[in-house]
């Protein structure tokens, strides 16, 4: 198991090379809210459009503006610094008296909407994200690229966790191993080491990285076998747009029809204590994919940390996928994804896209 494994492509070999995020405007993300504001309560709900500022920075800025602790700021998800993004924040103001909103507006940040709500905005409380991505310096046959995009829209893609989950050069996986009391030797084997004690936020980040790495490893096996979007005996099914899981159950025409219309998807493990939800052939693939020493160490560490077995869909279908050639070497993509899904998974099925924002060391930011 490598910290930064090369993922297989489900739709075949790369059909382009390109550059992404040469400027922030090339990567635009708008949150799709999960609810309408109540219009009452003591949490000021702000919709903020920002450029070159990540979520944590804006949260700190809002806390300073409101004169409250950062724990009084809520947001649904993290947005990257190297982008133009729109997202909601909640600001806890018990007296319902807000400072001057115009003080927040500058060239790189604007409050585009504000209202009141009766509770703090919780993590994950969004319907999804809409992306407008501009790829520049595109090299590839336009007709072949168009065909690949149509295939992605029709069939979907593997639901990879993106490289943002794993830190620079995949270092979060090695850090998770260290947290669990292991160190990797030069020959790749693991040796015992003192467990690292970390802040809760750091611990949570590394637990997520460990889980994500194991999931990607199972998905790699399914893609390589050509059954990432096909039923296996013992499959645990995930309902589209939810965390609900059912099965295993005998294959039927009803399941076939639901799979074909993307109502259900095969699922893979988010590792933790407890029995795998799947069985038979599906479980055999998962156990085989996670039988190497590093995977076993991550599995044991996640179980000891108190996480429970959960599932994640193996298949992802970008919603409303559309594209336009702005010129012979510039391709613009528009699509929406559910929470927790990565635009880079879409780009990977097209080819090698160099992220200009992550090439230089000083460009590191939260994802």
From Swiss-Prot:
Which Pfam families does the entry mention?
TruD
Q: Which InterPro entries match?
A: PsdUridine_synth_cat_dom_sf, PsdUridine_synth_TruD, PsdUridine_synth_TruD_CS, PsdUridine_synth_TruD_insert, TruD_catalytic, TruD_insert_sf, TruD_pseudoU_synthase
Q: Which UniProt keywords apply?
A: Isomerase, tRNA processing
Q: Which GO terms describe its cellular component?
A: cytosol
Q: Which residues form the active site?
A: 80
EC numbers: 5.4.99.27
The superkingdom of the source organism is Bacteria
Top-rank EC class of the record's enzyme: isomerase
Q: Name one GO molecular function term.
A: RNA binding
Q: Which reaction does it catalyse?
A: uridine(13) in tRNA = pseudouridine(13) in tRNA
Q: Which GO terms describe its biological process?
A: pseudouridine synthesis; tRNA pseudouridine synthesis
List the NCBIfam families hit by this protein, alphabetically: PRK00984.1-2
Family membership, please give it: Belongs to the pseudouridine synthase TruD family.
Q: Which PANTHER family match?
A: TRNA PSEUDOURIDINE SYNTHASE D
Q: What does this protein do?
A: Responsible for synthesis of pseudouridine from uracil-13 in transfer RNAs.
Name under which the protein is recorded: tRNA pseudouridine synthase D
């Amino acid at each position: 198991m490598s910290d930064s494994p090369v993922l297989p492509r489900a739709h075949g070999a790369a059909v382009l090379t390109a550059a992404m995020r040469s400027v922030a405007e090339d990567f635009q993300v708008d949150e799709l809210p999960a609810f309408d504001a109540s219009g009452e309560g003591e949490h000021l709900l702000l919709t903020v459009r920002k450029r070159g500022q990540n979520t944590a920075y804006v949260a700190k800025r809002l806390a300073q503006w409101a004169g409250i602790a950062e724990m009084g700021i809520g947001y649904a998800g993290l947005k990257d610094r190297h982008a133009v993004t729109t997202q909601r924040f909640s600001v806890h103001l018990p007296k319902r008296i807000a400072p001057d909103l115009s003080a927040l507006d500058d060239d790189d940040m604007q409050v585009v909407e504000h209202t009141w709500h009766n509770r703090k905005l919780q993590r994950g409380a969004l319907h999804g994200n809409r992306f407008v991505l501009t790829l520049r310096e595109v090299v590839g046959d336009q007709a072949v690229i168009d065909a690949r995009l149509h295939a992605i829209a029709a069939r979907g893609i593997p639901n990879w966790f993106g490289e943002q989950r794993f830190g620079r050069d995949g270092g979060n996986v090695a850090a998770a191993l260290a947290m669990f009391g292991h160190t990797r030797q030069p020959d790749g084997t693991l040796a015992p080491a003192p467990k690292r004690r970390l802040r809760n936020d750091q611990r949570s980040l590394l637990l997520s990285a460990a889980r994500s790495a194991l999931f990607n490893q199972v998905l790699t096996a399914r893609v390589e076998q050509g059954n990432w979007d096909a039923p296996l005996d013992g499959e645990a099914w995930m309902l589209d747009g939810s965390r609900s899981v059912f099965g295993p159950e005998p294959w039927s025409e009803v399941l076939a029809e639901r799979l074909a219309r993307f109502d259900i998807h095969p699922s893979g493990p988010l590792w933790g204590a407890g029995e795998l939800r799947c069985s038979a052939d599906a479980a055999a693939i998962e156990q085989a994919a996670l039988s190497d020493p590093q995977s076993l160490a991550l599995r044991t560490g996640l179980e000891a940390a108190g996480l429970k077995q959960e599932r994640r869909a193996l298949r992802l279908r970008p919603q409303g996928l559309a594209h336009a050639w702005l010129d012979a070497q510039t391709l613009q993509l528009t699509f929406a994804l559910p929470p927790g899904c990565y635009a880079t998974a879409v780009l990977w099925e097209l080819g090698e896209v160099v992220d200009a924002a992550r090439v230089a060391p000083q460009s590191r930011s939260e994802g």
